[in-house]
A protein has these predicted regions:
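Conserved SAM-binding loop
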Residues: 112
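Extended, histidine- and acidic-residue-enriched regions that form the cofactor-binding/catalytic faces
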Residues: 1-109, 117-264
């Protein structure tokens, strides 16, 4: 069908685009350091880029792409310069109000496209709050959760390369190569790998997790092998994730809004 940028529509055009199946898509990024080789806008660039690439690939739904939420919860990066952050309660309140505003325009389906791990628990709480308080079907999913082309990303990077590593660096080479300093990229070995190798149960992240600051993972504020990244790998990852995310949006568009409909 079609996608539109919410902010570029006239009010009458937006009203005409809204049906029971229309999906609003909110990209959520961050402004925070990503090691010596990537810009502060990395997560915001990836969130916005992935939202547009995904929306373009949607075939069986109408998608309204909301303005990107650039400042989110980045307090694990506070010891580095340039970080802009909200606390969890503020971010939760902001997204809740955005969601309710979307609902007032007649939409009941919202997807939160996330590009920063620190936002995850807040977005999950908001998704349920919007179900309770606004009767919305809200889904939160990071673009990296869509997976990668078979064999492209090393298992060590999938597990530990969570910040400024191979995946994010390659994706940034695809979207904004001009902002990437590959001469400063290297293998930022994360402490989480050492912890996993030397403990049976304790982990820094995952189902068993600790409250860490980013320098607890690596003193340079990155985690993963950025030196492996290429623009070609980034393009392949982005295209794979965008296809999967477009499918998610289509499925959200078709999903019943009530349990009564599911049971029927």
């Amino acid at each position: 069908m079609a996608y539109h940028l919410w902010s570029e529509l006239k009010a009458s055009e937006l009203a005409a685009a809204v049906t029971d199946a229309t999906v609003a898509l909110l990209p959520v990024g961050a402004i925070e350091q990503h090691g010596p080789h990537l810009p502060l806008c990395t997560d915001t660039t990836l969130a916005e880029g992935m939202a547009l690439e995904s929306a373009k690939r949607v075939r069986d739904a109408t998608v309204l792409v909301l303005p990107t939420l650039s400042v989110a919860k980045s307090d694990e990066h506070l010891d580095f310069p340039g970080v802009l952050t909200l606390d969890a309660a503020t971010l939760q309140a902001v997204i809740l109000q955005i969601g309710k505003s979307v609902a007032r325009s007649g939409l009941r389906r919202l997807v939160l496209l996330n590009a920063h791990g620190g936002n995850v628990p807040v977005l999950q709480v908001v998704a349920r709050a919007l179900r309770i308080e606004a009767g919305m079907f809200c889904v939160s999913a990071g673009w990296m959760s869509m997976g990668y082309p078979q064999g492209l990303v090393p298992e060590s990077e999938i597990r530990d390369g969570i910040h400024g590593g191979f995946v994010e660096t390659a994706a940034m080479l695809h979207f904004r190569e001009d902002l990437v300093a590959m001469d400063l990229a290297r293998d930022f070995v994360p402490q989480s790998r050492h912890v996993a190798e030397n403990n049976q149960v304790l982990r820094l992240m995952g189902p068993v997790s600790a409250g860490w600051m980013v320098q607890d993972l690596n003193v340079d504020g990155a985690a993963g092998n950025a030196a492996l990244a290429t623009r070609e790998a980034g393009q392949a990852m982005v295209e794979h994730a965008a296809r999967r995310y477009a499918l998610l949006i289509e499925e959200v568009s078709r999903h019943p809004l009530s349990f009564d409909a599911v049971e029927a």
